[in-house]
């Protein structure tokens, strides 16, 4: 079953100079029980898409889409209150820099118990409070925190970033969401803690059937854990498909450049040889190129690239390029 089905999502920011199109006609789908990766450089629009899904963008943003379906229901056509009710019930999101997302004036116990729904808990107010405490302890155990008493009695500043992120995950799964969105959840964490968190989300997917949208700018980190992968560049979807296929046979020059820039994907690279890197840097929103936004940096760019390429399909592999790699085979 398809949980999330977005077609041609466009996000525009109102500025004093006019509208700036930060996300340009991006399509994204997520099946039940699937882990989908969303990868791209900083500034590619990954977090904006996540915030659009959970409806937390402010009034300066304009959201347009041909389709924005959650379990067959078009969220953009619903009243805001009903939209928020559905999102609050079915979708949860964890952010980067978790210690800044937690309330510094409240203990972890207070914040975690507040995130636990009271529906279905037996007894009066006092009894429900005890049930919430027990469930909070169970949630901490589920995310790998054994010293629950010390963590529950602590304030966020007293905990490490890794423990705070585990607390955020516990708060997110307290209501058993159908979709968990993880927006760069391992930023500034140690490598061992990163692996722990990725394994945790993988186990939640396997044991609970929870779908996960995993957002990162580190291709090697999420490639191991995702079933399908979408690659963004400067607000445009450049490639999408099964993770193994995208990594083995990239059709877009940007995806190919990402893969070549990761040492783990280049086992035959001679020692001390520089990794491949595209020239230049990602453009600012105020100075976006016309047509394909990779054009000024692309080694395969030609005059046709001043026109925005359409999203093409080769079996279950999607790409957006006038001159894809392996051009003859893909035609």
Language model segments and positions:
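A short, proline-enriched helix->beta-strand linker immediately N-terminal to the Walker B motif
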Residues: 174-178
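P-loop NTP-binding/switch modules centered on Walker-like glycine-rich loops
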Residues: 41, 185, 189-270
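Hydrophobic anchor residue at the start of the ABC signature
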Residues: 169, 180, 193, 197
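Conserved ABC transporter NBD signature motif
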Residues: 62-74
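Charged, flexible cofactor/metal-binding loops and thiol motifs
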Residues: 242-331
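Conserved ABC ATPase "signature" region
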Residues: 74, 130-150, 259
């Amino acid at each position: 079953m398809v949980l999330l089905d977005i077609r041609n999502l466009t996000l525009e920011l109102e500025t004093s100079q006019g509208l700036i199109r930060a996300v340009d006609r991006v399509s994204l789908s997520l099946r039940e029980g699937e882990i989908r990766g969303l990868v791209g450089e900083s500034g590619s629009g990954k977090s904006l898409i996540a915030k659009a899904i959970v409806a937390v963008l402010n009034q300066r943003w304009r959201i347009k889409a041909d389709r924005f379906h959650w379990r067959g229901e078009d969220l953009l056509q619903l009243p805001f209150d009903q939209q928020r009710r559905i999102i609050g019930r079915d979708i949860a999101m964890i952010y980067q820099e978790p210690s800044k997302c937690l309330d510094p004036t409240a203990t972890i116990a207070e914040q975690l118990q507040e995130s636990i729904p009271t529906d279905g808990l037996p007894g009066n107010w006092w009894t429900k409070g005890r049930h919430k405490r027990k469930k909070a302890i169970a949630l901490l155990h589920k995310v790998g925190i054994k010293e629950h008493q010390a963590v529950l009695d602590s304030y966020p500043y007293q905990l490490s970033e890794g423990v705070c992120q585990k607390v955020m995950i516990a708060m997110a799964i307290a209501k058993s969401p159908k979709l968990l969105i993880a927006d760069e959840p391992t930023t500034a964490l140690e490598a061992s803690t990163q692996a722990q968190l990725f394994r945790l989300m993988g186990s939640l997917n396997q044991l609970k059937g929870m779908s996960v949208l995993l957002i990162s700018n580190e291709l090697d980190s999420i490639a191991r854990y995702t079933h399908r992968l979408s690659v963004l560049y400067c607000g445009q979807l450049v490639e999408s498909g099964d993770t193994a296929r995208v990594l083995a046979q990239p059709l877009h020059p940007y995806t190919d450049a990402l893969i070549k820039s990761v040492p783990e994907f280049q086992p035959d690279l001679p020692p001390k040889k520089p990794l491949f890197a595209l020239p230049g840097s990602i453009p600012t929103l105020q100075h976006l190129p016309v047509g394909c936004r990779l054009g000024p940096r692309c080694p395969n760019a030609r005059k046709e690239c001043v026109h925005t390429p359409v999203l093409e399909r080769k079996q279950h592999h999607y790409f957006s390029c006038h001159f894809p790699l392996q051009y003859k085979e893909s035609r």
